[in-house]
């Protein structure tokens, strides 16, 4: 068994809620250990959605390659199965070149599915089911469809925001197509042994008020950087940019564009939605096995992360 473990590639992950400094720490660790970053963010995969997804600026990368960023158009679908396949290819290439793959992001389902080696069976959606569900969504509304999901698959519903119509429909589609809950599929698709030797570093602020202040400040900075123009682009293409149109950072401004709410109210709504999202991220990562939590407010947080990574790599 020890020999098998030694053959596994080491993979580092930096996780945690939004606005905790994951990007900067990922870059620092990549500089210290000849690493390359794989973005584990479900929205940074899309081109043109830069401000609202808090993509790393070129000057902030310090020359470190960042993968799984800006590779799809906003109207192209991208699933967790797609991410696991893409990240697997990227990891193999990075490791083959003698560099350290560093997963950085806050999409917990992506991180966990990749590190745990979840296998996704190809399932055929019955003809007309997707169209039927979309029609039901239009007729009954998001709240009714979410309540249906809560009955059919409570665990999936708990992990999906009620306003995320795309994911609600996907979960219902899976249930109606297979008669099984997503959680059942996940349990059946876990391999007996994880494919990578991993260290998962989690960033959080012990003072929740400090995290919320950082989130509010980040929203203000995003607005200064052109978030409203980006949100208007998504609004204008909302029929085709369906995933982006459900994303936090864009949909909150739709009432402003429709003339039904002032900008200040929409901005406050975004701040509240971001705070709620941070809570859900924390809940997800707190339930993941083996996360080593670091105080993001500590002056020596980077030094501590470097030390832990050095010890982790030495064990390989």
Predicted regions located by residue number:
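Phosphate/pyrophosphate-binding catalytic cores of soluble transferases and nucleic-acid-acting enzymes
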Residues: 1-316
């Amino acid at each position: 068994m020890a020999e098998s473990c030694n053959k596994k590639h080491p993979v580092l992950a930096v996780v945690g809620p939004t606005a905790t400094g994951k990007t900067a720490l990922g870059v620092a660790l990549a500089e210290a250990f000849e690493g390359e970053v794989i973005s584990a963010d479900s929205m940074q995969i899309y081109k043109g959605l830069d401000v609202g997804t808090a993509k790393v600026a070129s000057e902030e990368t310090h020359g470190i390659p960042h993968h799984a960023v800006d590779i799809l158009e906003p109207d192209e679908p991208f699933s967790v199965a797609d991410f696991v396949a893409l990240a697997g290819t990227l990891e193999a290439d990075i490791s083959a070149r003698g560099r350290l793959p560093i997963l950085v992001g806050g999409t917990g389902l992506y991180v966990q599915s990749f590190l745990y080696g979840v296998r996704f069976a190809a399932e055929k959606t019955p003809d007309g089911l997707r169209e039927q569900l979309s029609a039901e969504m239009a007729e009954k509304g998001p709240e009714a469809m979410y309540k249906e999901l809560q009955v059919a698959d409570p665990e999936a519903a708990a992990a999906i925001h009620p306003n995320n119509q795309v994911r609600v429909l996907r979960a219902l589609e899976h249930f109606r197509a297979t008669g099984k809950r997503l959680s059942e599929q996940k349990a059946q698709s876990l391999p007996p042994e994880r494919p990578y030797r991993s260290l998962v570093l989690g960033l959080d602020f012990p003072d929740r008020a400090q995290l919320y202040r950082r989130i509010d400040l980040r929203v203000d900075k995003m607005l200064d950087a052109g978030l409203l123009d980006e949100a208007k682009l998504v609004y204008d293409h909302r029929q085709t940019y369906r995933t982006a149109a459900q994303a936090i950072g864009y949909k909150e401004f739709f009432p402003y564009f429709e003339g039904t709410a002032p900008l200040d109210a929409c901005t406050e709504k975004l701040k509240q939605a971001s705070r709620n999202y941070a809570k859900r991220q924390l809940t997800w990562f707190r339930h993941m096995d083996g996360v080593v939590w670091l105080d993001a407010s500590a002056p020596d947080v980077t030094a501590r992360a470097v030390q832990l990574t050095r010890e982790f790599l030495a064990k390989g």
